[in-house]
């Protein structure tokens, strides 16, 4: 089952991206390298509630 998740920048805490994930394959919180337009660089984005 795919669920909607929000990704937040670890440096400025802005919630920049919405995506979906498969809870069966990824039961833990995901971390991705994404571009943050507020920091103006690529940073780690973590899944938030």
From Swiss-Prot:
Q: Gene Ontology terms, cellular component aspect?
A: cytoplasm; ribonucleoprotein complex; ribosome
Keyword annotations for this protein, in alphabetical order, are: Ribonucleoprotein, Ribosomal protein
Give a Pfam family name: Ribosomal_L33
| One GO MF term | structural constituent of ribosome
Q: Which GO terms describe its biological process?
A: translation
> The organism sits in which domain of life?
Bacteria
Q: Ribonucleoprotein among the record's keywords? A: yes
Family affiliation: Belongs to the bacterial ribosomal protein bL33 family.
- Can you name this protein? Large ribosomal subunit protein bL33
Native organism is: Clostridioides difficile (strain 630) (Peptoclostridium difficile)
């Amino acid at each position: 089952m795919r669920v909607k998740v929000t990704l937040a920048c670890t440096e400025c805490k802005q919630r920049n991206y919405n995506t979906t994930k498969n809870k069966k394959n990824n039961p833990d919180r995901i971390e991705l390298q994404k571009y943050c337009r507020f920091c103006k660089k690529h940073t780690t984005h973590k899944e938030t509630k």
